[in-house]
Curated annotation (Swiss-Prot):
The keyword Membrane applies. It comes from the Archaea. It is found in: Cell membrane. InterPro entries: Aur1/Ipt1, P_Acid_Pase_2/haloperoxi_sf, P_Acid_Pase_2/haloperoxidase. The chain crosses the membrane at residues 9-29, 65-85, 94-114, 167-187. GO terms for cellular component: plasma membrane. This is Uncharacterized protein MJ0662. Keywords: Cell membrane, Membrane, Transmembrane, Transmembrane helix. The keyword RNA-binding does not apply. SUPFAM superfamilies: Acid phosphatase/Vanadium-dependent haloperoxidase (SSF48317). It is a multi-pass membrane protein.
Amino acid sequence: MDKRILVRLAIYPIAYVLWGGLMWYSQIITPLDVTNLLLKLPLCNKEFYIFLQSLPNIVIEFFKIIYLYGFSSMIIGGIAYYLFIKRDFLKSDIILIDLALGWLFAGLIYTFVVVKSPFQVGVAKDLINMHYFWIFTKPTYEIPSLHTAYSFLLALHFKDEKPLNYIYFALAILIPISTLIMGMHWIVDVITGVLYGYIIYKFPKTIHIKISKALDFLAGHIKPCILCGKCKERETHEK
């Protein structure tokens, strides 16, 4: 197996564990709870969630599957597609780093400002037993919705990959809807999540490229001098 793949198979899980562990820096201070302000906005009320959660059971179960498995499949499948099938290591690195940066910046927001989820304030029911996921997330991680942001982000990364782009854009629509039906997020979370995903997608990729080259260096794919970018050998190598 290509050493570049082996290096990434070793680094990616470590990055994921660190990504999940970063949630604990939000415990440093007591954040400002703005849930009451959000409850005054349109569609942020019990009537809206009663309507959503009274949909036919088959619809509820469908969106439960989308919430639990569609989201993780987008992320794991997206990275695996570029890593194993396309063998586009830079692209797989960019996606992972985008996800990490998305969590880092959102985590700063969650540290200072929180909003309780609909089921926490009795506006909706928790249809997925959220407490099973609290090792890597919390029900106060609401604005922006990372489920929405990441699904939209992945869809943008796959926009030129036909026919997979149709699947990814479909999931980018279904996943935000599932967060509402499951009682996990507010409509405001979804809207801000879309905007946040777009911002992360457009974020300059300078650091992404440097990290990707560092991983290639660890795999022995490039020589040390290539990292500096000041010699002609790099140009020859990249051609």
